[in-house]
Amino acid sequence: YDLQAPENQTICSVFLYGKSVCQGYAKAFQYLCQRAGIPAVLVTGTVEDGTPHAWTAVCCRGEWYYADPSWGDVSYQTEGAEEAGMEENGAEADGLREQVDYDFFLVTTEQISRTHTADVPFPLPECVSLTDNYYVREGLYFTRADMEQVAEAFETAAQEERGSVTLKCADETVYEALYDRLLTQQEIFQYLPGDSVSFAVSQEQLTLTFWRTSEL
């Protein structure tokens, strides 16, 4: 993500120069979806602080979802973490971030509306399905504070040698319960043994992300 990227309102900024802003990201994502036979629509509007923004609506296997490719780029969150609703906890968190954040990938209207307000001259689809949501497909979506599911999430991350684990909660009740178990009661050390664990939480997006200074 680079505000000074050349031709940053077009797909050229992405494919020719490897850097862009939200409009370039969204148009490039739309183009790739369309090349793959996936219907995709460019959506423009604003985010929480009134800043103009662009994202997409895509149709996967007959169901519509929203996807914000620029907010999925960690370099964007480094520039505007507060705008993206992410609260950092732990001095090492920035250096341990993965390159992709899935909080805004194939989400519902209800989820995207927490941070995004569309302003387009055409009706947008009501996105209600979670079937192809990243966290659902990866077993990281929690409808209750299921500690066996938590254990499986960390075991899978270790097997796949991933440096972080993000848990997505269905609602605030689940979020608060997992926060209490893993952080307040420090049960996180059952899954990431060691002296310290870096983490980031987003109550707005109902996610808890954990890293260690060494790989899982």
Label every PLM stretch briefly.
Residues 2, 68, 200-204:
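Acidic/polar residues at beta-strand termini and the immediately following turn/coil
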